[in-house]
Amino acid sequence: MALITLRKNLYRLSDFQMHRALAALKNKPLNHVHKVVKERLCPWLCSRQPEPFGVKFHHAHCKKFHSKNGNDLHPLGGPVFSQVSDCDRLEQNVKNEESQMFYRRLSNLTSSEEVLSFISTMETLPDTMAAGALQRICEVEKKDGDQGLPKEILENSIFQALCFQFEKEPSQLSNTSLVTALQALILLHVDPQSSLLLNLVAECQNRLRKGGMEVRNLCILGESLITLHSSGCVTLELIINQLQGEKLETFTPEDIVALYRILQACTEKVDEHQTFLNKINNFSLSIVSNLSPKLISQMLTALVVLDQSQAFPLIIKLGKYVVRHVPHFTNEELRRVLEAFIYFGHHDTFFTKALEHRVAAVCLTLDPEVVCRVMEYCSRELILSKPILNAVAETFVCQTEKFSPRQISALMEPFGKLNYLPPNASALFRKLENVLFTHFNYFPPKSLLKLLHSCSLNECHPVNFLAKIFKPLFLQRLQGKESHLDTLSRAQLTQLFLASVLECPFYKGPKLLPKYQVKSFLTPCCSLETPVDSQLYRYVKIGLTNLLGARLYFAPKVLTPYCYTIDVEIKLDEEGFVLPSTANEDIHKRIALCIDGPKRFCSNSKHLLGKEAIKQRHLQLLGYQVVQIPYHEIGMLKSRRELVEYLQRKLFSQNTVHWLQE
């Protein structure tokens, strides 16, 4: 009875022309049948076990059974295909009711065993249905993670018979069946060098050269070849050329994203394809509303890789639709969206609000790399989001062990940059200090310096670690193989040293050698100060000239001996009279005007950035009377007279000063 069942199952694959194979098996005992099938099929079947590195798996009938880590098959670091969906595209190609019923039943099956059991009951199995069965097996296995097929499925005679006919007679398959089978087998981690995949790829390339493949099949084939590292850009160029001849209006959203990903694989020829890319970018505006979260993240990633900064209308529209998908993105998809927004410098209030809700709700379950990208997004765009920062601080305190040294640095740096201390600041920095004590040498030198400098911006001075970073050994590590230490690192070291002198007088450790110090924190490439807003300065200068009577009574952009540049300096004598800016004697008080434009504040609030807060703090400790002139106060003044009165109140609140009439 068992032999009849096996023969029946194999016979029902009639469209694969299996009658001759059955005739040969007909007179053999059952154990011989299983032995023959296994010995023929096992050399090219491949399974991935849940191991972090490449593995090999052998069993009694499969001496050549071999698997590589699936990560090796993903050169672009993203999901392999733009859409591996519910067999819908195959169902569209089927005309008769019986076949449509097959696909409906297939889509309801939830395990590989159910799929194989179902197809074993079929009287006939056309190639499109066989390919659909493979694809459904792929889909249900992927739901449990990227781990390949279990041993019991690989050894199932129905599954082996399916694969055997795909290997033996690929020329008999339809275009859709061919590329669908190739797609599914790749996702099931069949060995790229197996005769099965080599035969399928060769047949695909042969049909590609002949032309006439449909758009969807070309897109699937292109992504398959990318995954296999097959044929380089030569075959992909042929696919791109054929797709260029098609009307974009006939492409589905999945096809458009696949096209982006194919172009993404040929970045060295992006200039040659730019005209085509411009056409795709413009057309994509019409399909954004139909993109799934996965497709949106893939399109954004492709735009980054292809450096499509000029496609800003598309980026803005994608950003608009990203907002509604924030709750539904996977960790990986959210990470890619954030990377794209960081790359293009895009942000908006609605996305930030959606991100706040997502992070606050699930921060403890977010992948560490996603948490770092969220913090980098806030840091790059200068977004002070208290819900996000508070949630991340709580996550770090509760789950410190899941973050690497590099990630800890990336996670903590925005707190200093945005000049914000969360409610659990004491627990946060106590936990950080413990990590630094135990893992100090595991931190990359530059990441460590950024981390400690960020703490100092927030008045959380890393006194216990200053002695270590000022030592020549650490400074040599920081310099690495370069001929000299970079300007930014020297500036951060200098500001840490200045903070130790001004704010930590009890620190008695090593000092920073003069050769590692900078003369000014205001440098063109990597400044620790924000240059004064030129338009705002000109407006204030007019008011000061009217208030003080002449231009000679104040000096602009004064570099102090302590590396800081003062926007405007005013000198007073002991009686409070204003001295000429050139005076060097009888100076009783120096006023430092900080003309703070929008770039000195967080982008979404009137909260001063960390680097400006430490500057004003240090100037006060150095004896300056710091007077802040923020842009939002200046913007409310309606006349020059109001400006002069405003400056008088700021500078000389207790004195009577006369100014010139307008």
UniProtKB/Swiss-Prot annotation:
Keyword Acyltransferase on entry: no
- Which SMART domains does the record associate with it? RAP
GO BP, sorted A to Z:
mitochondrial cytochrome c oxidase assembly; mitochondrial RNA processing; positive regulation of mitochondrial translation; regulation of mitochondrial mRNA stability
* Alphabetized PROSITE patterns for the sequence: RAP
Which sequence ranges are marked TM in the entry? none
Q: What molecular functions are annotated in GO for this chain?
A: RNA binding
Which UniProt key words apply to this protein? Answer: Mitochondrion, Transit peptide
Effect ascribed to mutating residue 22 to V: In a breast cancer sample; somatic mutation
InterPro entries, from UniProt?
Answer: FAST_2, FAST_kinase, FAST_Leu-rich, RAP
Organs and tissues of expression: Expression detected in spleen, thymus, testis, ovary, colon, heart, smooth muscle, kidney, brain, lung, liver and white adipose tissue with highest expression in liver and thyroid.
Q: Name one GO cellular component term.
A: nucleoplasm
- Which parts of the sequence belong to the RAP domain? 591-649
- State where the protein is found: Mitochondrion
One Pfam family name is: FAST_2
The record's family statement is: Belongs to the FAST kinase family.
Q: What does this protein do?
A: Required for normal mitochondrial respiration. Increases steady-state levels and half-lives of a subset of mature mitochondrial mRNAs MT-ND2, MT-ND3, MT-CYTB, MT-CO2, and MT-ATP8/6. Promotes MT-CO1 mRNA translation and increases mitochondrial complex IV assembly and activity.
Entry domain remark:
RAP domain is required for FASTKD3 function in mRNA stability and translation.
What name does the UniProt record give this protein?
A: FAST kinase domain-containing protein 3, mitochondrial
Q: Which organism is it from?
A: Homo sapiens
GN (gene name): FASTKD3
